Amino acid sequence: MARFLIEVPHEAEQIACLRSIQVFLSSGSHFLTHADWGCMDGVHSAWMVVDVDNKTEALNIVPPAFRKDARITGLGTWVLSDIETMLAKHVGSPSQP
């Protein structure tokens, strides 16, 4: 499985914002009912981190009305030794911070 960040923006108007949240919460989907929201800070988006097989599967979690504006980002992690090896190939030796 792969890990993805799903970002779902919605309109900032209060009634549109509330309806967007209502759609997510009434879906019954574990992912949607556990979304994090930025509305209280003026960022009208929901975020979820999900472990699924691919981007299409991640997008299909999003309610259909919100899919066209959703952004799916594949996530990964790094370890310092891998970065130092890659840097050494490009510049001859790892850079020191």
Listing of model-derived features with the role each one plays in the protein:
Residues 1-97:
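Conserved, structured core segments of small domains
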